[in-house]
């Protein structure tokens, strides 16, 4: 019965031997899922730190409640179910349903994401934070 009590996810992405961005998220069971989606939104889809922080995301419920808690019946593992942010486009919803997923929706599907982008070309840093907390992306 032991379970982790802290699963902080500070991350640094490197490019050409230099830090490209530093980022992290709160959110228990969904932290790694949300960080990967954030990272891919930046490196694959060209979003800014702020755009990627606020982008809609999708969570699985395969390992729900790994940190413990009291909502055991509500948050037990549900294979084949996905939790989507309300802002996920209709065409994505349609594709996921066609693949056989059961979808549920919430206004907020991620903990606060905070990030700093290191712009080595212009010798500056760019911060971004999701709108899910009272957080700020600050670098110096």
Can you say where each PLM-predicted feature lies in the sequence?
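Proteins synthesized as precursors that undergo proteolytic processing into mature forms
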Residues: 1-107
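In a subset of proteins, long, contiguous C-terminal domains/tails are tracked
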Residues: 90-140
